[in-house]
């Protein structure tokens, strides 16, 4: 299977991270953690015979978080992937909600997105 593995969020040109941080609660920086974890996930998927492309936004390049989506979508849409996975962490507070989406493409492939 051809898989795109994307890392949620980025490091902006001004040095700010666009993801959440749970450091206040003993956690971690979402972007840094997902970026590191994506290497492990990609290696495991490749070991099982899949073709994996990691898509990580260039660091200290974007001025705004709104530049992340088109950067990733251009690469995803050009890649003809069977599956797209984007890594995120849940927030360390009770105010955030998780979303589950199921998408179906024109080629009738179904996907679950967390």
Give residue ranges: language-model regions.
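Active-site histidine-acidic residue metal-binding/catalytic motifs
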Residues: 1-73, 79
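A short, glycine/acidic-enriched catalytic loop
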Residues: 12-29, 91-114
